[in-house]
Amino acid sequence: MTRKDGRAYDELRPIKITTDFVKFPEGSCLIECGDTKVLCCASIEDKTPPHVAEGEGWVTAEYSMLPRANRERSRRDVDKLKLSGRSAEIQRLIGRSLRAAVDMRRLGERTITIDCDVLQGDGGTRTASVTGGFVALALACRKLVEEGYLGSTPIRHFVTGVSAGIVDEQPMLDLQYSEDSRAQVDLNCIMDETGCIIELQGTG
């Protein structure tokens, strides 16, 4: 069996990250992993949710797909009057992963919200969102330092994600949709720059 796009089984798709893709957020990027494209934007607010300890900050995330990000149109969550279970699960994963990157005490009493909007989905949207979300987060934190609000960046780890799986009994890295949709095992791995695993999420 060979992969549809000609990659080796342990080969990533080409990755391209365009920073400052839109001008209004404190940090933004477009991440492209093969044909998967996700717009990630970081917004800063000078307040925190009630559950956050005094003097600390918070990082959270939201995730959605454009109606025609896939082969067939899907309804917007707002049209269904509730967040889909899949979107809720993915944005919790993104939020947990990105919080592992930040020293909340150093961030101070601020909330950084990462919006991840899938423009085109061809597998690996959640791991692309984690990677792109981290880039947007780091850019927003750099802006806080450059504008004098912080003395140093609160980023303590670099965070990224990649998918892996087993398709037709063959282990593979970075599954595209044609592989993901028929995988016997689908695994998402979130790690930092030291190789420490932050989260594993798998189905089989």
Please name every model-derived segment.
Residues 2-7, 12-14, 104-111, 146-153:
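Flexible, glycine/charged-enriched surface loops at secondary-structure junctions
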Residues 16-18, 30-32, 39-41, 60-62, ...:
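Structured core elements
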Residues 1-32:
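Short, Gly/Pro- and small/polar-rich lid/capping loops
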Residues 15-18, 24-28, 45-47, 99-101, ...:
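Glycine-rich, charged/polar anion/phosphate-binding loops
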Residues 79-83, 116-125:
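A short glycine/serine-rich beta->alpha loop
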Residues 21, 29-107, 197-204:
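Glycine-rich, flexible beta-strand/loop modules in the N-terminal catalytic cores of phosphate-handling
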Residues 94, 98, 132-141:
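Buried hydrophobic packing segments
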Residues 85, 106-109, 124-128, 138-142, ...:
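A structural signal for small-residue-enriched, beta-sheet-centric alpha/beta enzyme cores
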